[in-house]
Regions:
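Conserved mixed alpha/beta catalytic, RNA-binding, or beta-rich assembly cores of soluble enzyme
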Residues: 1-55
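Phenylalanine-focused residue identity feature
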Residues: 19, 68, 79, 104-105
């Protein structure tokens, strides 16, 4: 298991994509906690996983201030197919987040 902060909707997601490609056993990502005002990095990650990017590297559907990635489509597409993302952004309840983690460990 890896736990970390996604600090931005661009560089942070680029780093996460490269990490996931390097470690193909990474299958599940839980997006939780508060969004950073302006960046909306959690929402951007969910949009990337759902919609991908346009030809300019802009995350389709992202509503943050700078949702542009430098990763190539060759990296983005395997990331999108390799991982499942669970949206718990609105959940402030640690019991719900812990329950979701237990589901992953029992699989």
């Amino acid at each position: 298991m890896v736990v970390g902060r996604l600090l931005s909707e661009n560089r942070g997601i680029d780093i996460l994509i490269k990490f996931a490609i390097k470690y193909p056993d990474l299958r599940y990502i839980i997006v939780c906690a508060n969004e950073v005002k302006g960046d909306k990095s959690g929402q951007a990650l969910l949009s990337l996983h759902r919609n991908g990017t346009n030809k300019n590297g802009r995350i389709i559907g992202a509503i943050g201030t700078n949702p542009f990635l430098t990763c190539s489509q060759t990296d983005i597409e395997p990331f999108r197919t390799q991982t499942e993302i669970y949206n718990l952004i609105v959940s402030k309840d640690m019991q719900i987040i812990k329950a979701q983690l237990l589901i992953f460990f029992c699989q």
